[in-house]
Amino acid sequence: HQKEAARRNVEALEAVQPQDLGAGEIGVRIGANWVPVEVYQQFMVELLTPNYYVRDRIRILRSEATGQWSIREKNADRSNVKANTTYGTKRMSAYHILEQTLNQRDVRVFDYIEDENGKKKPVLNKKETAIAQDRQELIKQKFAEWIWKDIDRRELLCRIYNETFNGIRPREYDGRHIRFEGMNPEISLRPHQINAIAHILY
């Protein structure tokens, strides 16, 4: 009897365990905090191929206190065409754009002009902003194409996602045991209707 009860308990637990989600069911927004820093670091290095001498200095960091992302030494790779042209602009490098993207911010380019009091004030440069935002969209697109390509990375991210977010299955209500005293016998309720009544009762 104990074995049978234990088996039933295991089956009941297995029945309520949510199915693990696969890569095709998981959306990864660039900058999502559940993605390890090393994954973003790898993406940056593979996309921008920084100069060998500065590669180890340019690091993506995340503040535990604020959740903000930053890229250290983002000005170190000045002669990189990918950073300055392909994925960046002459006014904003790809490292600056990636940092803003990780923080879910739209990039903007400002010119600073002096007012009548000699104080510098920022004025949005619409043309340069449009170019920078075009590069930002390109980086997002490249990230979406890249994120699931590597099998090891895919398995790692699926495991982290399922452990972090997919541990609780929404409660389902079973109303099969409910007796409807005095109800018109001509009326038969469908299973989902009975379960909905159970939801209200419990």
Predicted regions and their residues:
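Charged, low-complexity intrinsically disordered regions
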Residues: H1-G167
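ASCE P-loop NTPase motor core, strongest for the SF2 helicase catalytic module
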Residues: I160-Y202
